[in-house]
């Protein structure tokens, strides 16, 4: 109960996004002096309580009125509308107000906020409550930045869905771009310990295809899929790059037992299977990943099947339980590297300066296709004696699947290291 209350207070604190100050009456907030009449204005105010004709009464009306590259400022309140952003703009909650701006479309929606433009879109300070497939969604070569916002699922449906997703699966020359920072994502699922009976496969953030992404400083809770999912195009080609930095992940209940952070192709793989030609760099750095409810569904904290990059300075704390089971894409481990599905080895990759502690079965496990030794030095394994398994100590185990090369885990850290600035452990 205490953990739930703390989580609620953190969620409310971030969603408020407001400083303590005297609050103006929203009914008295009118349009800026330059925004009288006409279409295509640089700044548009949204205030359903305003009486003048120059102020938009809905967010969609404000989007339609503003010029490309302009700013839509939204006064506090709950807006029952699904939004389509079809031009570059900044959509922002007005700072300094006492209540949040909540986008809460009634009924079930395909997307509460859909971005349908290649031009840069900024979403700042909004709260999204929705029932349906997606909270915030962009398809194709979109350019979306989401800052200090909150996305909360309400009665999510069975089947696949996601709180925030950018999908670019078409083999074109354009690229998608996504930044999500300082935001709170809540899948709103109760504790799950088994895929039976089925529950919503709700992902936190999905980055797919020809996309460059930066996901930094977010809090993600109570999902039914991976809290973060980065995958290549569905044809197993293209280039996908992502930096997953400094996020706080907990209560990720992947119904497919894949992982809290999942890096690799979607399941099932296409049939007939094309050659895997996807390239990209996916860095997983400075994240804290827990399983505070001790769910058996968390078979890994980081499941790194494809691409190359750095897995560094993460805190992987008590994620894998003794009851965790293998799936078609992972054998239980705090950090899993490689593929059970016949894909090329993830490379080049380093696993360094992590705190890997309290994970049953394995702290690090490498798949059979990882035939070249990876650098796994300077990790803290929960014991000053080092890792167990392939290692000499009693800490979380290093497990090497048949045919794989043993990771280079020496030297190892003698104390927790992820939160330090250490560049060596000798």
Question: What does each model-identified segment do?
Answer:
Residues 21-61, 65, 76-78, 90, ...:
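Right-handed parallel beta-helix/beta-solenoid
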Residues 42, 70, 81, 87-89, ...:
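The right-handed parallel beta-helix/beta-solenoid scaffold, focusing on the short coil/turn
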Residues 57-66, 79-87, 91, 113-114, ...:
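Short, T/G/N/S-enriched strand-turn elements that build extracellular solenoid repeat scaffolds
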Residues 104-114, 130-138, 157-175, 189-208, ...:
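Extracellular beta-strand/beta-solenoid scaffold signature
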Residues 376-426:
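Extracellular/surface-exposed low-complexity segments
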């Amino acid at each position: 109960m205490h953990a739930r209350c703390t989580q609620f207070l953190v969620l409310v604190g971030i969603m408020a996004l407001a400083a303590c100050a005297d609050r103006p009456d929203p009914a008295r907030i009118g349009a800026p002096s330059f925004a009288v009449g006409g279409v295509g204005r640089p700044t548009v105010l949204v205030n359903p309580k305003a009486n003048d004709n120059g102020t938009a009464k809905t967010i969609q009306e404000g989007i339609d009125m503003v010029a490309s590259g302009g700013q839509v400022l939204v006064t506090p309140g709950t807006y029952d509308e699904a939004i389509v952003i079809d031009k570059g703009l900044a959509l922002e909650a007005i700072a300094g107000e006492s209540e949040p701006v909540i986008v809460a479309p009634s009924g079930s929606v395909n997307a509460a906020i859909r971005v349908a433009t290649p031009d840069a879109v900024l979403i700042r300070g909004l709260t999204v409550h929705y029932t349906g497939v997606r909270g915030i969604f962009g398809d194709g070569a979109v350019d979306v930045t989401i800052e200090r916002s909150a996305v909360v699922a309400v009665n999510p449906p069975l089947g696949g869905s996601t709180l925030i997703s950018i999908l670019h699966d078409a083999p074109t020359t354009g690229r998608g771009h996504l930044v999500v920072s300082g935001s709170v994502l809540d899948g709103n699922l109760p504790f799950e310990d088994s895929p039976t009976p089925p529950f919503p496969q709700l992902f936190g953030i999905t980055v797919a295809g020809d996309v460059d992404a930066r996901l930094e400083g977010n809090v993600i809770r109570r999902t039914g899929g991976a809290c973060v999912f980065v995958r290549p195009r569905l044809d197993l080609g293209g280039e996908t790059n992502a930096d997953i930095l400094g996020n706080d992940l907990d209560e990720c209940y992947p119904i497919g037992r894949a992982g809290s952070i999942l890096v690799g192709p979607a399941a099932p793989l296409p049939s007939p299977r094309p050659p895997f030609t996807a390239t990209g760099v996916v860095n997983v750095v400075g994240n804290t990943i827990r399983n505070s409810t001790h769910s058996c569904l968390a078979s890994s904290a980081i499941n790194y099947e494809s691409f190359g990059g750095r897995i560094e300075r993460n805190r992987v704390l008590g994620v894998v339980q003794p009851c965790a089971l293998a799936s078609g894409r992972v054998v239980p481990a705090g950090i899993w590297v490689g593929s059970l599905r016949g894909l090329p080895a993830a490379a080049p990759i380093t696993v360094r300066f992590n705190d890997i502690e309290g994970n049953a079965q394995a702290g690090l496990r490498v798949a059979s296709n990882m035939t070249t030794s990876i650098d796994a030095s300077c990790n803290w394994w929960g014991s000053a004696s080092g890792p167990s398994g392939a290692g000499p100590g009693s800490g979380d185990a290093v497990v090497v699947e048949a045919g794989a090369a043993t990771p280079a885990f020496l030297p190892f850290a003698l104390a927790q290291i992820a939160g330090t600035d250490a560049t060596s452990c000798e």
